[in-house]
Amino acid sequence: SNVESGVTTTFVLTPGGIESNLPDWIIPASLTLNFLAFACAFAGAYQLIRGFGERQNLALGGIAGVFIFAFLVWAAADNSLNIGGLMNSTLNKAVPLTLGAMSGVLCERAGIVNIAIEGMMLMGAMVGALVGSLTGNIWLGILGAVIAGALLGLIHAVLSIKYLLDQIISGTVINIFAGGLTAFFSAKFMQTYQELNNPGILKPFAIPILSKIPIAGPILFNNNIFIYAMFFFLIVLTVGLFSTRWGLRLRSVGEHPKAADTLGINVFRTRYMAVLLGGMMAGFAGAYFTLGSVGRFDEFMTAGKGFIALAAMIFGNWTPFGAFGAALLFGFSEALAAKLAILGVKIPSEFLLMTPYILTMIVLAGFVGRGQMPAADGQPYEKE
């Protein structure tokens, strides 16, 4: 490493603006980097000579964690980095990705490919800002966003279930439609009349007692309603999909629709319901951009997050918590890029902005085909 001996790295453990008695964590940068480099080299040699066998994925995860930690030590050498703030930012960046991925899980578990998550998010973001501004009520804005997502979900469902249109084409049409319509509304009305684009923003609120837990408390329990809702939906969807009759029926329709139909399950109704729920979830994810994060709508502000959410869904093996883990990974890369720009690290800012998208491509290249996608995913069903 090019870090001089005697230089220290300071990690601040509590997000900014929150009172805490936790001392900062000060570590010798050069010594730590040399030790971590030796540990990685040892792990590599062990893999070559004996191999980690079944524990290979665990070992790879551990080495990746060590590498990231070493990178943070190097980046913040002779400086300080707010780790608590980085983790809080990671969680916030992961919210729309997780909600979008859960939208994908709902649809694809029922056998409908939904690449229209991006368009649904964008429409949800715009309608949320517009309704919130017109009514002066953020909660009505969220409701408007959810309804907008549901309407696009209904269009996708009718095109792909009733008219048997190719699901990828249907999703692409919705993305283009949503992009054009939101850009038109934004340019024509929302940028011209600022009172139509000022919905306000949901403030974070601390959960008593839990928010006082050292380190984890301020990160997890001092947020706005979107983050708490994300955790609630994660639990509800996981239990619903894998521990209830409703979930069993939905999954059977995505695996073997013909067999499900034979057993008396209404394949069409189940798929319509799944895509509508998925649309509502994507609309809610879109509302996060305007009502939970920025407080206004800007053209194409979702910036491809709907597609990254799809990548998170695939990487998470079509399970809600798996997708959440992947969303945290993508969220971390985005939050880290922002922090490194502040630290003035000698890496071009354009490259830092590309990081989440590069990571998406790497993940998809390595993971597509390995996961267990639903057997009838993307296949239209016709009753005989």
Task: Identify the meaning behind each predicted range.
Residues 10, 15-23, 179-242, 345-352, ...:
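Transmembrane helix-bundle core of multi-pass membrane transporters
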Residues 1-17, 31-70, 219, 236-237, ...:
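Cytosolic-side transmembrane-helix boundaries in multi-pass membrane proteins
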Residues 106-127, 142, 161-174, 249, ...:
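Short, non-helical or kinked segments that cap or interrupt transmembrane helices
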Residues 44, 85-134, 152-168, 314-317, ...:
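Single transmembrane alpha-helix segments in multi-pass membrane proteins
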Residues 79-89, 241, 278-313, 338, ...:
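Inter-helical junctions in multi-pass inner-membrane proteins, predominant
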Residues 93-105, 119-126, 150-154, 232, ...:
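Hydrophobic alpha-helical segments embedded in the membrane of multi-pass proteins
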Residues 136-179, 232-235, 334:
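Alpha-helical transmembrane segments within multi-pass membrane transporters and channels
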Residues 220-296, 320-321, 325:
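Helix-loop-helix "hairpin" substructures at the membrane interface of multi-pass membrane proteins
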